[in-house]
Amino acid sequence: MALNSINTNSGALIALQNLNSTNAELTQVQQRINTGKKIGSAKDNGAIWATAKNQSATAGSMNAVKDSLQRGQSTIDVALAAGDTITDLLGKMKEKALAASDTSLNTASFNALKSDFDSLRDQITKAASNAKFNGVSIADGTTTKLSFLANSDGSAFTVTAKTLTLGGLGLTATSSFTTAAAAKTMIGTIDTALQTATNKLASLGTSSTGLDTHLTFVGKLQDSLDAGVGNLVDADLAKESAKLQSLQTKQQLGVQALSIANQSSSSILSLFR
């Protein structure tokens, strides 16, 4: 049987406990809605918070990986552009050498062709030396390979350099001809240089494709990590909004229950009137 006491109002105490519990839940839900997160700190859930922090750090480090790979892309793109120019120049050099091999040419015409040939040769040197991105080149013979970040653990994506200088193509700074016979011989030399250049460019193209593929993978991996972190810590706002309305109603009822419980002491007084 319930005990009526003016010293202890157990009904009010229970109502107050329930109201405090509701208020605590309400504060938590409001915080989740305000921040958009169900796990905002280690005290919310230490294990999940730690996992989310680690995954978030890994996802963040992927930005450095993407930056490095994009530099790699640009470095290769510059080398490929220079290579296109160089193969065009070699084609024109072959044309000049072929024309100069004509024994029916007069001296003036021969010398003009030789001058054009020499000028085209020198342009190859300029094209190769200017094939730099951010001061780095894989076409000018200054390096054998370049390594770019491949993952957050520091592993590398390595690109083998392809020298497109005159020396790298089997030519020299003095490669030329002084007779029609020498011009004819030069045709074969240029053909070899052209084949060498196209082979090197094909290899760079393969490296570029591989780098592009890996960059796409890194982007998808970063997106997956971000999504995973979101699944761990992000709040379901639709669910929290519905819960907020429910708790607000519960809070109002709790206030009324506490008010009713507090009135029980007054009802005891009426027994003595």
Curated annotation (Swiss-Prot):
Pfam families: Flagellin_C, Flagellin_N
InterPro entries cross-referenced by the UniProt entry: Flagellin (IPR001492), Flagellin_C (IPR046358), Flagellin_N (IPR001029)
GO molecular function: structural molecule activity
Cellular component annotations (GO), alphabetically ordered: bacterial-type flagellum; extracellular region
Localization, UniProt: Secreted; Bacterial flagellum
Keyword Secreted: yes
Function: Flagellin is the subunit protein which polymerizes to form the filaments of bacterial flagella.
Family of this protein: Belongs to the bacterial flagellin family.
PANTHER family the UniProt entry points to: FLAGELLIN
Protein name according to UniProt: Flagellin FljM
Organism from which the protein derives: Caulobacter vibrioides (strain ATCC 19089 / CIP 103742 / CB 15)
Upper lineage: Bacteria, Pseudomonadati, Pseudomonadota, Alphaproteobacteria, Caulobacterales
